[in-house]
């Protein structure tokens, strides 16, 4: 006989029901800043791509979606899910009760509450796949050989974006020298007299490079990252504690 928890999840799978975890909801909120629409594909990998096609994000989630479905306004969809996502204290410990998505129709999803929200349901209609198709890249990205590799802590990027706002600087520069030393700089590559905010980073580099990306293109989930930079004008940002990656283009 299966333990109660395993049986519960088996029943969810058999009835095409998915519990959407709080963590997945938070990552989807980040994805909504990259593209307001999304196409969920059958399985446990969620992808999105920016409208300008200069940033791709992919998340390997615990949920296993039973079908493809498109959401035109992802922020609206997530705001609706917040109605069913509550924190409840049990024996002094705060636990989240999360919404159950029931996929029994090709046109809409039925959302069920649990815990305090157990008596509530919602019906949310999918968008046409033709509308949201461009919001979900089908092919995986093959990253070329990296020319710089390093890690950053959560505070590192926060400091850089804060400096960019304070000094009104649009660019993030990755610099390396022949000795393999790496520096991240916030600057304006079009203005040689601009203010510069820099941080030396421990890592490895294959040579001397000076590669740029737009600060506005860095829309990532909070946390630490392992970063790869390629002279082929692409970067990979791999989250340290979540199965989450971003591929962000560098400027030519």
What residue spans do the PLM features occupy?
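Long, charge-dense
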Residues: 122, 127-144
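DNA polymerase processivity clamps
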Residues: 3-124, 143-252
């Amino acid at each position: 006989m299966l333990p109660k928890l395993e049986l519960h999840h088996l029943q969810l799978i058999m009835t095409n029901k998915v519990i959407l975890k709080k963590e997945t909801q938070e990552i989807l909120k980040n994805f909504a800043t990259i593209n307001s629409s999304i196409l969920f594909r059958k399985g446990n990998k969620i992808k999105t791509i920016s409208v300008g096609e200069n940033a791709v994000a992919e998340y390997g989630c615990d949920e296993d979606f039973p079908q493809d479905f498109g959401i035109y306004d992802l922020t609206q969809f997530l705001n609706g899910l917040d109605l069913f996502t509550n924190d409840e204290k049990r024996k002094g410990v705060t636990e989240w009760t999360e919404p159950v998505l029931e996929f029994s129709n090709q046109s809409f999803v039925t959302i069920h509450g649990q815990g305090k929200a157990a008596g509530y349901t919602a019906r949310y209609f999918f968008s046409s796949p033709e509308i949201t198709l461009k919001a979900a890249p089908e092919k995986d990205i093959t990253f070329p050989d990296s020319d710089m590799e390093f890690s950053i802590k959560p505070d590192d990027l926060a400091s850089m974006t804060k400096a960019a706002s304070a000094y009104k600087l649009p660019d993030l520069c990755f610099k390396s020298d022949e000795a393999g030393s790496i520096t991240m700089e916030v600057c304006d590559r079009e203005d040689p007299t601009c203010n510069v905010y820099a941080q030396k980073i421990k890592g490895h580099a294959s040579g001397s490079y000076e590669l740029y990306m737009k600060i506005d293109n860095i829309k990532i989930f909070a946390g630490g990252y392992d970063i790869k930079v390629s002279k082929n004008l692409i970067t990979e940002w791999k989250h340290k504690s979540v199965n989450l990656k971003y591929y962000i283009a560098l400027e030519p």
